[in-house]
Structures are given as structure tokens and as C-alpha cells.
């Protein structure tokens, strides 16, 4: 009877499922990425100087979502490397194409640049602590 209770106790702990922690990490990181990726995609499409610092800040934020160990960080890095177009909404993809084409078209370049500047302003406001010294 004691052995049965001990077996039941072990089967109910996190050690019984070695993938439980990885599932939690994936869920947290994908949730965060789905929130920030539209902004990152648009900054990239606008060829913004804010793209790389904002991307790096976002990666650092995902490190804060996981336990502080090498295996967790490796999972985070792998997710960021493979996520680029795997979660893109078709409407966002259409917007990216319009921005890229608009920047190449002399008739629309001014309007698209204004929209990109508005995005830059939004990002600087949203991440004010990151960009407060870079006027």
C-alpha cells in the first residue's frame, strides 16, 4: 500500500512529466511574441532604426518569462529563430507588402514614410525607458 501511495505521489509531481516545464515556456514565449510581433514586423518593413533595439528588448523580456537556466534560454532562442513567419496573420502580411511596395512607389512613398514615422513615435512612447536618451 505504501508503494502504491508513493507511486501515486510521484506521478502527480512535475517530475513525472519532463515536458511540462517546456510546455509552460513555449506557451509564455509564444503569447509574448504574438503580442509584439506585429510591431516588430512593421518596424522591419519600414526599415526603422528602432527595429533591432526593439527586437533585442523583446528577446530580453522573454528571458524574464522563463526560469533562469541555460536550457530555458535555449528554448527561448530557438522559438525566436523559428517564429519569423510561422504565426503571421494574413492581414498583417498584406499590410507588410503594402508598406514595402509603398516605400518603392514614388506616388505613395511620402504617405508611407509618414505612417512609418508615426509607428516610430508610437514605439518610442511605448518603450520610453528604452529610447529616452536617443531623442
Residue ranges of predicted features:
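Generic cytosolic/nucleocytoplasmic N-terminal low-complexity/intrinsically disordered segments
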Residues: 1-2, 16, 84, 88
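Immediate post-signal-peptide N-terminus of mature secreted/exported proteins
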Residues: 17-56
